[in-house]
């Protein structure tokens, strides 16, 4: 299907799902969003199918209670109130507010769940979320409260609370009542139709949004780590064959090969690294002890093998997060194509949480490498070329 989000300059319209590059533009370059006609049609089809289908059926969260209370029927006159109740009862977070960038990413993720056309929500909900994103209206969302096993219930409830005109938002640098900010922007609070209260609160969008931002930061860190590692080897005047293509092609890991390629690109034209064939392979060395390191220390020489797994993990994290953000992480799933509503557990967050645990390990490894490289720089007895702690003079006076 055609990409559901576009703006006047963005080539995203040609894609069939949002990419990390597009997310970067929206989050860090404030690229605006609009909903395409095809997208609006998809939302309307899903909503109208559910409206008809749910008339005489028992469907979780529409005419039943929530969680263990699903065994209890909700009478027709209380259906709308049920949707407001789940929002107000779950907006119970604690702790510091999530940074605005993470909340914006979470709203984009929730919007994309709705744009799959599997939630049965009214199109006005998607339009209002889009207005929040474009106008820089950021819901106040406390950081603590949910574990993700039943979706990011508490955090999403705080987002939902602002969509119905309640709670607080950050706007133009200030924390304010939502109602006044909506009025100032000419926006109307969302009115519930069938299941929008449950649909906004039920899913992985907050952890996915946080994951997307963290992944973007981690990718930047990795690129800096590669550049810094090349510079370290230039300082040490290392032999450059550790980053050579034949050596790294001998090991079949994509990450290792890519890191080595990036290092070769960084170092191209440098006069600071040495060629082993020019010095050690020329048959002229007769000394018993070599003055220059035949092999650099691990923290300089094993960069492709250390950052390679980090690169591979970032690739896998991107795959998982982009799959998740382009998924319907809702329950139940409303499917106009098969004319049915399916109950399951697409709100469950293990895909994202597993990947974020792995991402933490990867970033830790990256930081450990940086620490070892700093240790090399600071200790003159290790590097043999710099004064202690890289101080230029009066080293004995610098305690």
At which residue positions do the language-model features occur?
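Conserved phosphate/anionic-ligand binding catalytic regions in large, soluble enzymes, centered on
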Residues: 58-71, 143-162, 346-370
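N- or domain-start disorder-to-order transition segments that initiate the globular core
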Residues: 9-56
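Conserved small/polar residues in nucleotide/adenosyl-binding loops
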Residues: 1-8, 395-399
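Accessory "access/gating" subregions that flank catalytic or transport cores
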Residues: 234-368
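C-terminal catalytic subdomain
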Residues: 350-398
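Active-site cavity-forming subdomains of large catalytic enzyme subunits
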Residues: 91, 95, 105-253
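Glycine-rich loop at the start of a catalytic domain that most often binds anionic cofactors/ligands
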Residues: 68-83
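Short, hydrophobic/aliphatic alpha-helical segments
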Residues: 40-58, 128-143, 185-190, 195, ...
């Amino acid at each position: 299907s055609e990409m559901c989000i576009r703006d006047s300059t963005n080539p995203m319209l040609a894609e069939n799902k949002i990419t990390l590059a597009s997310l970067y533009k929206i989050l860090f370059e404030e690229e605006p969003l609009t909903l395409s006609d095809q997208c609006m049609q998809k939302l309307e089809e899903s909503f109208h199918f559910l409206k008809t289908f749910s008339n005489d059926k028992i469907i979780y969260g529409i005419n039943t209670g929530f969680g263990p209370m699903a065994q209890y029927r909700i009478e027709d006159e209380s259906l709308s109130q049920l949707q407001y109740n789940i929002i107000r009862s779950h907006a119970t977070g604690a702790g510091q507010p999530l940074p605005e960038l993470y909340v914006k990413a979470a709203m984009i993720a929730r919007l994309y769940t709705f744009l799959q056309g599997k939630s049965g929500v009214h199109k006005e909900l998607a339009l209002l979320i889009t207005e929040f994103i474009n106008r820089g209206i950021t819901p106040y969302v406390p950081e603590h409260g949910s574990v993700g096993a039943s979706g990011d219930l508490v955090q999403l409830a705080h987002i939902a609370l602002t969509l119905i005109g309640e709670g607080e938002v950050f706007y133009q640098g200030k924390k304010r009542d939502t109602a006044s900010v909506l009025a100032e922007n000419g926006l109307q609070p969302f009115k519930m139709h069938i299941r929008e209260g449950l649909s906004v609160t039920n899913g992985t969008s907050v952890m996915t949004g946080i994951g997307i931002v963290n992944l973007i930061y981690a990718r930047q860190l990795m690129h800096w780590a590669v550049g810094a590692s090349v510079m370290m080897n230039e300082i040490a005047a290392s032999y450059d064959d550790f980053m050579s293509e034949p050596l790294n092609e001998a090991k079949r890991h994509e990450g290792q090969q890519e890191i080595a390629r990036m290092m070769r690109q960084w170092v191209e034209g440098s006069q600071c690294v040495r060629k082993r064939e020019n010095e050690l392979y020329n048959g002229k060395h007769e000394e018993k002890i070599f003055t220059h390191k035949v092999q650099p220390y691990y923290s300089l020489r094993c960069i492709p093998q250390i950052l390679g797994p980090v690169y591979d993990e970032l690739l896998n994290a991107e795959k998982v997060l982009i799959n998740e953000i382009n998924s319907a992480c809702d329950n139940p799933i409303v499917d106009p194509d098969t004319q049915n509503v399916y109950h399951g557990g697409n709100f469950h967050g293990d895909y994202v949480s597993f990947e974020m645990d792995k991402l933490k390990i990867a970033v830790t490894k990256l930081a450990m490498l940086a620490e070892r490289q700093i240790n090399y720089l600071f200790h003159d007895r290790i590097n043999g070329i710099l004064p202690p702690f890289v101080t230029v003079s009066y080293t004995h006076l610098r305690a």
